[in-house]
Amino acid sequence: MVLKELRQKRPLVHNITNYVVAQFVANGLLALGASPLMSDAIDEMQDLAKISDALAINIGTLNERTILCAKEAIKHYKALNKPIVLDPVGCSASALRHDTSLELLESEGISALRGNAAELGSLVGISCESKGLDSHDATTPVEIIKRAAQKYSVIAVMTGKTDYVSDGKKVLSITGGSEYLALITGAGCLHAAACASFLGLKKDPLDSMVQLCALYKQAAFSAQKKVLENNGSNGSFLFYFLDALSLPIKLENSLIKEEW
C-alpha cells in the first residue's frame, strides 16, 4: 500500500498554498507521514525544486506575486521531471482564477489536477454549480473528469460526496467520507497536498490517487464517528481528522468502483 511506503520515506512536499490554510495543510501532511515545506518566495524556487519530491500549487488566495511564483516553480519542477499538483480553487468564480489556472495547465508541467465539479467543469467548458451539476446540463461527473484528464494530459481528481479519478482512459469512483469535510476550511487544500505526497513516491499515478482518495474518506469517516460519540461538531472534527490521518488506515477496496 502506498501509505506504508509514504510513512517510511516521508517525501518532502513543497506547497505554494493559500494563507488561510497553510498551518492546517502542514499539520495534515505531517499526520499523514509526509514532510511539508511551505514557501512562495520566487527567488528560492529553483533551490527548493532540487530538494523536494513534489509540488502542490493552490490558488486560494491568488495575487500577482503568487502567480509569478507558481510559474517559476513549475518551470523548475518540470525540468527535473518532478510531480506537480494544481488545485484551481474557485476557478469558476472569477476570470483571474480561471485564466491563471488555464495558463498553468498550458505549461504542460502539471501532473495532477484536483478540484470539485464546478472547478473542473469550468476548465473543460461545462457549467456546474458548486453544489453539483447545473440542472440544465446533462453531463455526468464521469464525463467531466474524463474530459479534464484527456484535455490536459493529467491525472484528474474530482472530490465531493463521491470522488472520481481518471487518467483519460479509466474512471474510478470512491465513496464514503463525511459531511464534515465540507464544514471545515482547508479539507480540499490538504487533499491536494496529500495527492502531491503520494505522487512524490513515483508509483503508478492513477492507483496512487485512487488510494489517496479512499484513505482520505476513511479517515474522515473515522473522525466523524469520534465526533458523534463525543457530542462534538466542526471544531472537534478537525482535530479528530488529523488524528485519524496519523493512525494506521486499512485500505477498503469496497469503496472503489470502476466507472469507465
Curated annotation (Swiss-Prot):
Binding locations of ATP: 114, 159
Function: Catalyzes the phosphorylation of the hydroxyl group of 4-methyl-5-beta-hydroxyethylthiazole (THZ).
Matching InterPro entries: Hyethyz_kinase (IPR000417), Ribokinase-like (IPR029056)
Cofactor(s) the protein needs: Mg(2+)
Any one Gene Ontology BP term: thiamine diphosphate biosynthetic process
Biological pathway: Cofactor biosynthesis; thiamine diphosphate biosynthesis; 4-methyl-5-(2-phosphoethyl)-thiazole from 5-(2-hydroxyethyl)-4-methylthiazole: step 1/1
Keywords for the protein's UniProt record, in alphabetical order: ATP-binding, Kinase, Magnesium, Metal-binding, Nucleotide-binding, Thiamine biosynthesis, Transferase
Family, similarity comment: Belongs to the Thz kinase family.
Gene it is expressed from: thiM
Organism: Helicobacter pylori (strain G27)
UniProt-annotated binding residues for substrate: 38, 186
Family annotation (SUPFAM superfamilies): Ribokinase-like
UniProt catalytic activity: 5-(2-hydroxyethyl)-4-methylthiazole + ATP = 4-methyl-5-(2-phosphooxyethyl)-thiazole + ADP + H(+)
One annotated GO molecular function: ATP binding
Name of the molecule in the record: Hydroxyethylthiazole kinase
Record-listed E.C. numbers: 2.7.1.50
